Amino acid sequence: MARCLYNSTIREFLQLSPEALLGRFVNNYHGTALTVTNEAWANEIHIMQEVLQPWKDEDGQVIFEYDIPRLGKRIDVVLLLRGLIFCLEFKVGERDMLQSNIEQVLDYALDLKNFHLLSQNRIIVPILVPTRFRTSSSEFIPSVYDDSIYNPLVTGACLLYTSPSP
């Protein structure tokens, strides 16, 4: 059984239409995808295709809906880029930064670090994306645990687009 709904290089991801990608998500999903789930995936696909455009020539991977068996949850997006692991949790339509959502994305990063062999010696940057949030944290601060996990960043979707180019 696959541990994610979609996994490809950044280049391959950018070459597919949002409709084709959504079709793959639905086909790979084990269960009935509700309309709200499909809409969230469509939003995440659109956002990530915009965000990753400047990185199209990079040797990176993008993974959607990665299973975290210990929690019985899925990380919305795992991005492997330039030796870093970015763990993104989207809250589509949300305007606010909730502490419970920050804790959720940090838990995902901790689970990757502690229970995924290939992540153990990598730097992990958790990012919470309440899509309608109007501000952004941009200070990269290592956690107090000296475990190569950074404190979660929080940004609205529109501010992900304004990240510096490679």
Residue ranges and their predicted role:
Residues 161-166:
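Conserved small/polar residues in nucleotide/adenosyl-binding loops
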